């Protein structure tokens, strides 16, 4: 069972011009604690609800934080992905191609 067989593309992604307020609303709507941040189609990092809540101005744009960037290749085994999700306490894990292109995410569910 490879990760690529479990990718969901229904998870919204963030861009650097999105506001913290917008990101928090998406997290609430999708019941997630993390969302991937992309630059064009390249995965940059995982933005957490905790980090967004710590920002002094929720109407400010997210910018280009590269704080925490866990991801897994589409060709890795599903058990590796689940181990990463558990180890880091993630609500989702971004899946990337060999060249770093964001393909989607897998969730605990």
Give the positions of each predicted feature:
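Histidine- and aromatic-rich ligand-binding microenvironments
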Residues: 19, 51-52, 64-65
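Short beta-to-alpha loop/turn elements within the nucleotide-binding domains of ABC transporters
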Residues: 1, 18, 47, 60, ...
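Short beta->alpha transition motifs characteristic of CBS
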Residues: 8, 32, 36, 42-58, ...
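Bateman (tandem CBS) regulatory domains
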Residues: 1-11, 58-69
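The conserved cystathionine-beta-synthase
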Residues: 13-31, 38, 71-91, 95-98
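Nucleotide phosphate-binding site architecture
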Residues: 4, 12, 21, 53-54
């Amino acid at each position: 069972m490879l990760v690529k067989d479990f990718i969901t593309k229904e998870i919204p992604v963030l861009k650097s011009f999105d506001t913290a307020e917008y990101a928090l609303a998406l997290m609430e709507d999708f019941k997630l604690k993390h969302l991937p941040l992309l630059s064009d189609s390249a995965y940059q990092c995982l933005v957490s609800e905790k980090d967004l809540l710590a920002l002094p101005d929720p109407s400010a744009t997210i910018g280009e934080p590269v704080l925490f960037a866990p991801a897994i290749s589409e060709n890795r085994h599903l058990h590796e992905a689940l181990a990463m999700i558990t180890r880091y306490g993630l609500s989702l894990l971004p899946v990337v191609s060999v060249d770093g292109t964001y393909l989607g995410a897998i969730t605990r569910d």
